[in-house]
Swiss-Prot record:
Keywords: ATP-binding, Cytoplasm, Ligase, Nucleotide-binding. This is Cyclic 2,3-diphosphoglycerate synthetase. It is an enzyme of class 6 (ligase). SUPFAM superfamilies: P-loop containing nucleoside triphosphate hydrolases. InterPro entries: cDPG_synthetase-like (IPR053199), Cyc_diphosphoglycerate_synth (IPR016557), P-loop_NTPase (IPR027417). It is found in: Cytoplasm. It catalyses: (2R)-2,3-bisphosphoglycerate + ATP + H(+) = cyclic (2R)-2,3-bisphosphoglycerate + ADP + phosphate. One of its GO terms (molecular function) is ligase activity.
Length: 434
């Protein structure tokens, strides 16, 4: 059956005429506007279907879809009652419930969400470079304390067929990754990074394209899931890519929000859809913006999803091998301010001398220029992403330099404990309580 969204800017007989033309309409939600209508009771009688109305149109939409079997919602409203932001917010609610949303010249259709036969956790982001892979690695390392997690990724440089990396067994060295790159694969793909930083089994998949809601045009995640179901492991972590995430009906969701993002990408468009899914929300890079912006982001999130637990975090670089006493260059995707903070942290915490820095890990030509300028170093510290292997690692090994990969560890700056929050999710997924 269908539901229609109506307003008081249309005469009731016009609305009734449109409802009749649509057909199979079980109910309507009144969005606002009073210019051309009388009271709600007479409007309901005129349109001939049950009418939901009240102060909050979002609450009324939720109530209507809970009380009726709705497969499609038709928007018969218009400006000034609804603006673009309103419509995106309505779409977010409807798509979360698997309901198509259609207007005069637009249509948002839900993607079929597949089920998985193991407890599952999706980690998605509100954009690229928000630290989603770092959070996934942290979550996997944490869940290892109580379970055997498997990570399924969906990178834009992933393999054509699902690829299993036994991070719990395989020694992932710079030489190994260079050989992978020379074989034609993207050796800095997310499943390699996760395997290196968390030491769990990962399954690399590929995807192409990303829609407005967050689903890919093509991907092979379903094949990866089938492998995960057969492997030893009791929790499957489904890791998104950029603002895209797997079309899987997960048991739990963690949404990663970058504090440096534009506010409208969080509160508008399909930011509310991603936030609305979350059981746990991790705001990353919270040390890179003002207190006022953090407070604004928190208020937006709380207005969209008041039940989600929110954690404010900053990333601290964590070398995966000993670096004490070394003269190193630091290569990252971080912006200049973040790169400087990372360098200071490494020098103060690990007693290493940073003699050169590059923020151009995601820009191959500029990275090559940067590397050609550096002198008097013995070690390259680099994140495993972007051009880390085919440029940074290959160049370092060519000149006899040591390569040490670094992880970005999320650290709470709000006196909360992200590790405990992740463990709580893990216990719930296992059907147990700590």
């Amino acid at each position: 059956m269908r539901m229609v969204l109506i307003d008081g800017e249309h005469y009731p007989d016009v609305t009734a005429w449109a409802i009749k033309k649509i057909g199979d309409v079980s109910c309507a939600v009144f969005l606002g506007g009073t210019e051309k209508i009388g009271d709600m009771k007479s409007l309901e009688e005129k349109i001939g279907v049950k009418l939901y109305y009240g102060e909050s149109y979002i609450s009324n939409i939720k109530k209507a879809i809970n009380e009726n079997k709705i497969g499609e919602v038709i928007d018969l409203s218009d400006e000034p009652v609804l603006n673009y932001e309103d419509r995106f917010r309505i779409a977010a609610v409807l798509l979360k419930h698997g309901i198509k949303y259609k207007g005069a010249d637009f249509e948002f259709s839900p993607k079929e969400m597949v089920q998985i036969n193991k407890p599952s956790l999706t980690i998605l982001g509100t954009g690229k470079r928000v630290g989603k892979t770092a959070i996934s690695g942290f979550v996997a390392r944490t869940l290892k304390e109580i379970s055997k997690p498997i990570i399924v990724t969906m990178g834009r440089g992933g393999p054509e067929e699902p690829e299993i990396i036994e991070g719990n067994k395989l020694e992932i060295t710079p030489d190994f990754l260079v050989r992978v790159a020379e074989s034609g694969k993207h050796a800095a793909s997310d499943h390699f990074e996760d395997a290196l930083t968390s030491r769990v089994i990962t399954i690399g998949c590929r995807r192409c394209g990303g829609g407005m809601v967050g689903f890919s045009f093509f991907d092979i995640v379903n094949k990866g899931i089938k492998l995960a179901e057969k492997l030893e492991g009791d929790i499957v972590i489904l890791e998104g890519s950029g603002a895209t995430f797997p079309a899987v009906k997960a048991d739990k969701y963690i949404t990663v929000v970058g504090a440096t993002q534009r506010i409208e990408f969080i509160k508008s468009y399909f930011g509310p859809f991603r936030i609305g899914l979350a059981d746990l929300i991790v705001i990353t890079l919270a040390d890179m913006v003002s207190k006022e912006k953090i407070e604004k982001i928190q208020k937006i999130i709380e207005s969209i999803n008041p039940d989600a637990e929110i954690h404010l975090t900053a990333f601290k670089p964590r070398p995966l091998s000993e670096i004490k006493g070394k003269k190193a260059i630091l290569v990252m995707t971080a912006p200049p301010e973040g790169l400087e903070k990372a360098a200071r942290h490494l020098e103060n915490r690990y007693d290493v001398e940073i003699v050169g820095k590059s923020a151009n890990l995601a820009n191959r030509p500029k990275l090559i220029e940067d590397l050609s300028r550096f002198k008097y170093y013995d070690t390259v510290l680099v994140e495993l992403k972007a051009a880390a292997v085919d440029v940074a690692t290959k160049e370092a090994l060519k000149y006899g330099k040591e390569v040490i990969y670094i992880d970005n560890e999320p650290v709470n700056i709000d006196n909360k404990n992200l590790r405990e929050a992740v463990l709580e999710i893990g216990w719930e997924l296992k059907g147990e309580r700590k």
